[in-house]
Amino acid sequence: MEEINREEFQEVVVNIGRVTKVVKGGRRFRFNALVVVGNKNGLVGFGLGKAKEVPDAIKKAVDDAFKNLIHVTIKGTTIAHDIEHKYNASRILLKPASEGTGVIAGGSTRPIVELAGIKDILTKSLGSNNPYNVVRATFDALAKIKA
């Protein structure tokens, strides 16, 4: 695979989580970040980073996202066909839309679809709204699209 130029990618933080560990002296906080990166030209990836500070968690998540890049097949401004995918308790439904419809997506699905470069799509998130599971379900669905 050719070398990837990180400058042409945009990144979006989908979720920041705080985890608390209670110790004898009080509470210890740690953070995790779920980040999506994409070049709006079919390449998109997501990553999870964990650290004691939020900026460090985001940086780790971005590095992880570049290791998990996938290529999304785009037909014109939309996807080629309907697809439904389930990951754990989250189900995602993706449907192609006619030109001019725009991105109709909510929550964690919108940044993925936009950063992939899809301009017209209808999406529906069913079941669990856990951000990580919705992102995984969306990625798996986009990876399964055939031209």
Curated annotation (Swiss-Prot):
Keywords: Ribonucleoprotein, Ribosomal protein, RNA-binding, rRNA-binding. InterPro entries: Ribosomal_Su5_D2-typ_SF (IPR020568), Ribosomal_uS5 (IPR000851), Ribosomal_uS5_bac-type (IPR005712), Ribosomal_uS5_C (IPR005324), Ribosomal_uS5_N (IPR013810), Ribosomal_uS5_N_CS (IPR018192), Ribsml_uS5_D2-typ_fold_subgr (IPR014721). GO terms for biological process: translation. Residues 9-72 form the S5 DRBM domain. Signal peptide: none annotated. Pfam families: Ribosomal_S5, Ribosomal_S5_C. GO terms for molecular function: rRNA binding; structural constituent of ribosome. GO terms for cellular component: cytosolic small ribosomal subunit. The N-terminal domain interacts with the head of the 30S subunit; the C-terminal domain interacts with the body and contacts protein S4. The interaction surface between S4 and S5 is involved in control of translational fidelity. Belongs to the universal ribosomal protein uS5 family. Part of the 30S ribosomal subunit. Contacts proteins S4 and S8. With S4 and S12 plays an important role in translational accuracy. This is Small ribosomal subunit protein uS5. It comes from Helicobacter pylori (strain ATCC 700392 / 26695).
